[in-house]
């Protein structure tokens, strides 16, 4: 069996040396060459579009796939995990579902575009949870609205995981950047984030693009950030 680790932020993130991009994941899966695969997960989520791509790549894989949640599967990592043939969760692991979130700037029309994008993403994500658990869509989206955290036993009871493993307990850890988007994070995650190896630069530290005048030639496109992915509102994607 081929082992693949997703032990950091999903997406190619400068603030997390353990981050895993969709390209990284696809390369490792290709190297497995049809062999059974176990994806070991300890991730607070990240870039929703990388997670979607990773999920589709895993779903299309020809060999048998297992997702082993060993510390944390939160946000984008939670619905990515559900695309495996079997989802196994460690006895001390946590599972979390919530709504996608964004940082946006611009005019009123830009805010409406950002909100519309979030609504669409929320719908596609909730569909993944419904498919796995068999719960009603309204029930799933109510759980997402509340940012709901599940113990391993609760995750199995609600249908997010198929069974608990008998592995040794593993501490859940999440990057401080991912932690910013959590409203109801357990206390232990705060402590884990405090031990991060890097200081996270605030969004305000980014420098403007050269020649970016107010609405003039060379002006930077308006962007929104969805779970770590910066998108041009015209449809492009940038980090």
Where are these regions (language model features)?
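N-terminal organellar transit peptides
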Residues: 1-76, 83-239
């Amino acid at each position: 069996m081929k082992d693949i680790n997703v032990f950091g932020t999903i997406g190619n993130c400068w603030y997390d040396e353990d981050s895993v991009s969709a390209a990284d994941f696809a390369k490792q899966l290709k190297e497995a060459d049809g062999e059974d695969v176990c994806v070991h997960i300890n991730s607070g989520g990240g870039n929703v579009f990388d997670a979607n791509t990773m999920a589709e790549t895993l779903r299309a894989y020809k060999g048998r796939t297992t997702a082993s949640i060993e510390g944390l599967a939160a946000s984008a990592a939670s619905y990515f995990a559900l695309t495996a043939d079997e989802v196994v969760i460690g006895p001390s692991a946590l599972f979390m579902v919530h709504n996608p979130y964004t940082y946006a700037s611009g005019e009123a029309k830009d805010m409406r575009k950002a909100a519309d994008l979030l609504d669409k993403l929320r719908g596609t994500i909730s569909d993944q949870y419904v498919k796995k658990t068999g719960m009603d869509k309204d029930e799933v989206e109510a759980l997402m609205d509340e940012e709901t955290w599940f113990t391993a036993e609760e995750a199995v009871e609600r249908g997010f995981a198929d069974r608990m493993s008998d592995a040794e307990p593993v501490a859940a850890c999440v990057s401080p950047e991912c932690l910013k988007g959590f409203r109801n994070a357990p206390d232990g995650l705060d402590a884990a984030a405090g031990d991060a190896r890097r200081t996270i630069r605030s969004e305000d530290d980014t420098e403007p693009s050269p020649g970016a005048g107010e609405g003039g030639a060379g002006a930077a496109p308006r962007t929104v950030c969805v779970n770590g992915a910066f998108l041009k509102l015209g449809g492009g994607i940038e980090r």
